[in-house]
Amino acid sequence: MIDRYKHQQLRIGLVSPQQISAWATKKIPNGEIVGEVTKPYTFHYKTNKPEKDGLFCERIFGPIKSGICACGNYRVIGDEKEDPKFCEQCGVEFVDSRIRRYQMGYIKLTCPVTHVWYLKRLPSYIANLLDKPLKELEGLVYCDFSFARPITKKPTFLRLRGSFEYEIQSWKYSIPLFFTTQGFDIFRNREISTGAGAIREQLADLDLRIIIENSLVEWKQLGEEGPTGNEWEDRKIVRRKDFLVRRMELAKHFIRTNIEPEWMVLCLLPVLPPELRPIIQVEGGKLMSSDINELYRRVIYRNNTLTDLLTTSRSTPGELVMCQEKLVQEAVDTLLDNGIRGQPMRDGHNKVYKSFSDVIEGKEGRFRETLLGKRVDYSGRSVIVVGPSLSLHRCGLPREIAIELFQTFVIRGLIRQHLASNIGVAKSQIREKKPIVWEILQEVMQGHPVLLNRAPTLHRLGIQSFQPILVEGRTICLHPLVCKGFNADFDGDQMAVHVPLSLEAQAEARLLMFSHMNLLSPAIGDPISVPTQDMLIGLYVLTSGTRRGICANRYNPCNRKNYKNERIYETNYKYMKEPFFCNSYDAIGAYRQKRINLDSPLWLRWQLDQRVIASREVPIEVHYESFGNYHEIYAHYLIVRSVKKETFCIYIRTTAGHISFYREIEEAIQGFSQACSYDT
């Protein structure tokens, strides 16, 4: 059983048959060793008790009820005076029934079987290590052809031919008949090898260090040859080099983790604890069983049949034995991963069996549904909304969430400031929501970052740290620029908030995970904090302005006349004189006082270089004043000159929205320049 205080991680890998036996076997007090499941039965149909040596055997997996054996005797658990510690009649130990959640069993396979994950999953680890085509290995595993066993240094009958099925098709039917003839069993066992046993022998003969050396030499030779000029040959060389790299990495991994390649072929099949594959009785007396039980029963049936063929009858045809070995291999494949070889196996109701892979993988699998993604302490969850007034590194937490997340810190603050005598009084003050509680909460939040996470976390920017502030409502406020890293938008997305507790976690959150420190994509280096969606629409509205030209006031409906030279008035048109401003602060102030609109044209005095003005550009109008000064009016700017043609000032034609956008960019550039100067 995994101790949660000693084990911080879980790794799935290959184990040796000895390790499987150590997990599954146990020695009961009378000296008998139990653990092997030999019968495909579950419960007796009359007594409704587990069958002995079956898939739910109490001798192997422990009692169904704590302290009660299969006979019905009761003993107090943990009482040293109680003797004996097990029932001598049925062999069941008097232990806690929770042992059935982690006590394993095993099935001793009559013939070796390959683990389908390492044979059929891509890339195929077995094919990579043996450097053979997957199709050839599948034919060998499923007894479609045989392999000559190199048992001596001298050539033998079949060693001259090797894997003969692919070379001479006429041998396809004659050779099996030859070897299945009565009296040739010794010769057959000496000369040929087929099934997963042949794969196991080849894997056991591998030297991983020699594989690495030979692969490296071949990779260097292919790299020195250079391009051949033939596109097809060049592609084959590239694929071969990639294969050699994968093969070397795989061999290094086996050496580093002390895993033997032959462990990919199973001799002992582990049996899951009964509580992980239960049989439940529902209303009406009907039983509901896990599909794993039916798949285990199929394996045991076929394995026992193969055992009977090999032990009870010496004259069993070899073809029948090979066919039964193939059935055992297919049964184990279905148990581990149903449907990986094509059409999945179904029950009587045409429903696909859920194999071990289906139980553990996917969103509804054991890991993601039961072990991962669960609620933890000091965490919350809510819908995100936009917070346009927030800084990039801040987020808004609702009061209801914040007081729950930081409740222990607030209690400590109340006790330290002698505002509460104990924890109970502090909790009552928090429930009453006294003003001092919010003051202490704000002090706590100022020195404590929080982590925001949006599922699915596909890269490291899926979880970032922020400085929290209190907001009203029940939603989390987020700066819109950080949405791209989370792949989030404000259409109802939810995010989880976590509080880092340890000093190491807080230091990591402050130094590495703050949102304003993750402005570039870690994958390609492009900016990731860029305006999207609502911000782009807002910037468009801010800088769009009116489409009215500079001559709109002159050629407007107020100046329209009919054929009788009479003025035509329109009540919907409002004459707007374009105002002049000396600086941007006056223009923004006028907008805030609602004297001008956001998109209303205005003239702003500007320090513009004369060289940017095209000398060939002709003014649209020239207005003269009484003292001789005049205004040259162009499409987007206006120049005030003296009598001596000296330039007094220049006005540009813009809007309050453009001015506001320009000021934001200018402040950002100045802040960035100051930050760079501090770093240098």
Curated annotation (Swiss-Prot):
Cofactor(s) this protein cannot do without: Mg(2+); Zn(2+)
Segments forming a coiled coil: none
Secretion signal, residue range per the UniProt entry: none
GO molecular function term, any single one: magnesium ion binding
One Pfam family recorded for the sequence: RNA_pol_Rpb1_1
Annotated InterPro entries: DNA-dir_RpoC_beta_prime (IPR045867), RNA_pol_asu (IPR000722), RNA_pol_N (IPR006592), RNA_pol_Rpb1_1 (IPR007080), RNA_pol_Rpb1_3_sf (IPR042102), RNA_pol_Rpb1_clamp_domain (IPR044893), RNApol_RpoC1 (IPR034678)
Residues annotated to bind Zn(2+): 69, 71, 87, 90
Function noted in UniProt: DNA-dependent RNA polymerase catalyzes the transcription of DNA into RNA using the four ribonucleoside triphosphates as substrates.
Family: Belongs to the RNA polymerase beta' chain family. RpoC1 subfamily.
Name of the protein described by the UniProt record: DNA-directed RNA polymerase subunit beta'
Gene: rpoC1
